[in-house]
Amino acid sequence: MVEGMGKAGFFRWLCLEIAKLVKYRTIPVFITFMLMSFVLAMFIDSITVILFLAAVTLELAQTLKCNPVPIILSEIFCANLGGSATMCGDPPNIIIGTSLGYTFGEFISNTGFIALISLVVIVIYFYLCFHKELAGQGAVVQITSYPDPKEAITDKGEFAKSCVIFLLAVVLLVTHAQTGLTVAFIGTFIAILTLVTQYKDAKELLAKVDYKTLLFFIGLFVVVGGLEQTGVLEEIAGLISKLSGSNGMLM
């Protein structure tokens, strides 16, 4: 799904639209990109979000004549926070949520509020650290000189399909407790739907899947399963319990 969105130009279009909305002013771009990375990472892997945002940030920084490092650095922090807020934000969240039987709502009710508070702190912190540097930068350029968001869309049909599929994925994930669908089923369904609707680029999309990461997690699960079956994890848990004196706070 994410590769399909990227190929259709969704992420570049979104970034340029937001930059245009704040009239390409450096400080507003700095803040809105932090918020955008947080929101996107709630539903898309944070590393993927940063890869797409960083590319557009570098493009805008060249046009605005500003240092892209503070913006990208803040995006990384906010993307990590966004990924921690929901059950589908990052692979560890999916593992924890599914193993404990949490729904999307139950997971976000435990982590979402903490993530939001942390977001406010991070935004204020980075603003205080970099607002003077960024405020002193930025070239005065005619609006017509900035990249047009519409030019980011490589194919209007594929772009529309990608937007619909993304919204469908969000709706299914949020309502999976009511529908009875598992997170694994939703992910597989969305992937198949993307390949069917973008069948012309199916081979290219499949080639861009991060198989190394998938194999890593498969191997990791095998190792953890072996440790669990042999009782090693139980022994480690017992040792931690003894060392902490069964104190919940220390554990």
Predicted regions and their residues:
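Intrinsically disordered, low-complexity non-transmembrane regions of multi-pass membrane transporters
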Residues: L16, K20-K23, F130-F166, Y199-K203, ...
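Membrane-embedded alpha-helical segments and adjacent helix-loop junctions characteristic
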Residues: M1-N67, Y211-M251
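Transmembrane alpha-helix interface/packing and boundary motifs in multi-pass membrane proteins
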Residues: M36-D45, I76-C88, V174-Q178
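Juxtamembrane and boundary regions of transmembrane helices in multi-pass small-molecule transporters
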Residues: T63-V69, L73, A85-C88, G105-T154
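Re-entrant/interfacial helical elements at transmembrane boundaries that shape
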Residues: L14-C15, T48-E59, I72, T86-L100, ...
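Transmembrane helix-bundle signature of multi-pass membrane transporters/permeases
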Residues: L35-F38, V56, L73-G83, T111-L116, ...
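Hydrophobic alpha-helical transmembrane segments
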Residues: I27-L35, V49, I72-L73, I108-G112, ...
